[in-house]
């Protein structure tokens, strides 16, 4: 049976586990420091803990459960990792070099059931949720890469926007957030972490009550129900009116800005009237709204879509700006590698299938 990754425990949970096994609280603190401050690669490197405690840890936990399968490096410094999990499932993680630091995009599920018609992540249906440990391990793998090479760089920003719907794996994602945000561990600031959801309304409300200062992003991608339902199946369950009501509640409770992700699809959602509808939709919350216009990365399986022209994107941007909406055209990363989320995994799974036939 596969042992749980110790990365899956928050500091509080680690302390509770130690106390339940007859160990002192300060031992848990020592182990936590070895994991996240000294960032060791094995329990045997924890030089100030007893042999019996080391054995106890080795019997109950694994450290990093990921196995690297493929690494793609782009000319702009973006690195895309394909990892194999202990059950042979595969996930993707992306490192992006930004002006403000190193940002990592993590995956939260093996596959995705949300079924957005433009997305490579949903080409392979959800097999299971990732554990909190498997999500934390993605950050640790990237950080170890820099540590091992003596590079004085650290992961400073995290976006929970990889394969899967984070709020469909809510409990594990929340434990992941608490672990990486812990000031005695990786200490990645809450305001440097963004969680994206396609619009699971009950979980948006729950997230508003969580007390975490983590940023929220909404994968909106359309300004009206007709267009959104045609490209995002989730809109049937949670139409725009319900989604916006939940966001209004979130803003009222947290007073935090919400980012709206908007993939630009040629002749689908990119016309000036769509931009005006979006501006009207956000008018009552424009002080705490931020629109991220995203150039579409074409996916061969979704050839009904193509990216909007630069002219269409700029016109859309101008309409939003004239309406007082804060917006930006997202800078592209890794365009010379499998840039679309889920693309690398999908390609590799196809290769494996052919190989095994």
UniProtKB/Swiss-Prot annotation:
The keyword Metal-binding applies. It holds the Pfam family Radical_SAM. Binds 1 [4Fe-4S] cluster. The cluster is coordinated with 3 cysteines and an exchangeable S-adenosyl-L-methionine. InterPro entries: Aldolase_TIM (IPR013785), Methyltransferase_A (IPR040072), RlmN_N (IPR048641), RNA_MTrfase_RlmN (IPR027492), rRNA_lsu_MTrfase_RlmN/Cfr (IPR004383), rSAM (IPR007197). Belongs to the radical SAM superfamily. RlmN family. It is found in: Cytoplasm. Its cofactor is [4Fe-4S] cluster. Specifically methylates position 2 of adenine 2503 in 23S rRNA and position 2 of adenine 37 in tRNAs. It comes from Enterococcus faecalis (strain ATCC 700802 / V583). GO terms for molecular function: 4 iron, 4 sulfur cluster binding; metal ion binding; rRNA (adenine(2503)-C2-)-methyltransferase activity; rRNA binding; tRNA (adenine(37)-C2)-methyltransferase activity; tRNA binding. PROSITE patterns: RADICAL_SAM. The gene is rlmN. This is Probable dual-specificity RNA methyltransferase RlmN. It catalyses: adenosine(2503) in 23S rRNA + 2 reduced [2Fe-2S]-[ferredoxin] + 2 S-adenosyl-L-methionine = 2-methyladenosine(2503) in 23S rRNA + 5'-deoxyadenosine + L-methionine + 2 oxidized [2Fe-2S]-[ferredoxin] + S-adenosyl-L-homocysteine; adenosine(37) in tRNA + 2 reduced [2Fe-2S]-[ferredoxin] + 2 S-adenosyl-L-methionine = 2-methyladenosine(37) in tRNA + 5'-deoxyadenosine + L-methionine + 2 oxidized [2Fe-2S]-[ferredoxin] + S-adenosyl-L-homocysteine. GO terms for biological process: rRNA base methylation; tRNA methylation.
């Amino acid at each position: 049976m596969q042992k749980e990754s110790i990365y899956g425990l928050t500091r509080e949970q680690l302390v509770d586990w130690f106390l339940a096994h007859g160990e002192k609280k300060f031992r848990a603190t020592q182990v936590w420091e070895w994991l996240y401050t000294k960032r060791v690669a094995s329990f045997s490197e924890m030089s100030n803990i007893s042999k019996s405690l080391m054995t106890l840890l080795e019997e109950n936990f694994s450290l990093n459960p990921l196995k690297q399968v493929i690494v793609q490096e782009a000319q702009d410094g973006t690195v895309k990792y394909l990892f194999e999990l202990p059950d042979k499932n595969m996930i993707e993680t992306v490192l992006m070099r930004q002006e403000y630091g190193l940002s990592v995009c993590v995956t939260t599920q093996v596959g995705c059931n949300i079924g957005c018609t433009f997305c490579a992540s949903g080409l392979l249906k959800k097999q299971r949720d990732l554990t909190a440990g498997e999500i934390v391990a993605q950050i640790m793998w990237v950080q170890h890469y820099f540590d091992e090479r003596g590079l004085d760089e650290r992961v400073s920003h995290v976006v929970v926007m990889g394969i899967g719907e984070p709020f469909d794996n809510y409990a594990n994602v929340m434990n992941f957030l608490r672990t990486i945000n812990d000031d005695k561990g990786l200490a990645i600031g809450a305001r440097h972490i963004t969680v994206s959801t396609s619009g699971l309304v009950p979980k948006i409300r729950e997230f508003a009550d969580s007390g975490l200062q983590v940023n929220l992003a909404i994968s909106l991608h359309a300004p009206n129900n007709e267009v959104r339902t045609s490209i995002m199946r989730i809109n049937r369950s949670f139409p725009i009116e319900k989604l916006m009501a939940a966001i209004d509640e979130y803003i009222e409770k947290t007073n935090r800005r919400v980012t709206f992700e908007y993939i630009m699809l040629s002749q689908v959602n990119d016309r000036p009237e769509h931009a005006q509808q979006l501006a009207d939709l956000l008018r009552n919350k424009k002080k705490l709204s931020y629109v991220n216009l995203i150039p579409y990365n074409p996916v061969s399986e979704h050839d009904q879509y193509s990216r909007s022209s630069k002219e269409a994107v700029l016109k859309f941007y101008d309409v939003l700006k004239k309406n007082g909406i804060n917006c930006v055209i997202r800078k592209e990363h890794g365009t010379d590698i499998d840039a679309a989320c889920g693309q690398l995994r999908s390609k590799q799974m196809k290769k494996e299938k052919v190989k095994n036939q």
